[in-house]
Structure formats: C-alpha cells, structure tokens
From Swiss-Prot:
Domain of life, per lineage: Eukaryota
Subunit composition and interactions: The 4 large subunits of the cytochrome b6-f complex are cytochrome b6, subunit IV (17 kDa polypeptide, PetD), cytochrome f and the Rieske protein, while the 4 small subunits are PetG, PetL, PetM and PetN. The complex functions as a dimer.
Subcellular location, record wording: Plastid, Chloroplast thylakoid membrane
SUPFAM superfamilies from the UniProt entry: PetL subunit of the cytochrome b6f complex
Subcellular location, principal: plastid
InterPro entries: Cyt_b6/f_cplx_su6 (IPR007802)
Key word Transport present: yes
Protein name, per record: Cytochrome b6-f complex subunit 6
GO cellular component: chloroplast thylakoid membrane; cytochrome b6f complex
Membrane topology: Single-pass membrane protein
Function field: Component of the cytochrome b6-f complex, which mediates electron transfer between photosystem II (PSII) and photosystem I (PSI), cyclic electron flow around PSI, and state transitions. PetL is important for photoautotrophic growth as well as for electron transfer efficiency and stability of the cytochrome b6-f complex.
Length: 31
C-alpha cells in the first residue's frame, strides 16, 4: 500500500507541476 500511495502522490505532483508550467507558458504566449 505505501508504495502505491507514494506512487499516486508522485504522479499527482508531476501532473500539477506539468499543468502549472503549461498554464505559465500559455500566459506568456498570450502576453
């Protein structure tokens, strides 16, 4: 269980960082 939980936590963090970077690039392109 701990391995699965940490895996999902890492996946969620990676997804959040990726979406944040994508939004940042989109805002830069809009400017």
């Amino acid at each position: 269980m701990p391995t699965i939980t940490s895996y999902f936590g890492f996946l969620l963090a990676a997804l959040t960082i990726t979406s944040a970077l994508f939004i940042g690039l989109s805002k830069i392109r809009l400017i």
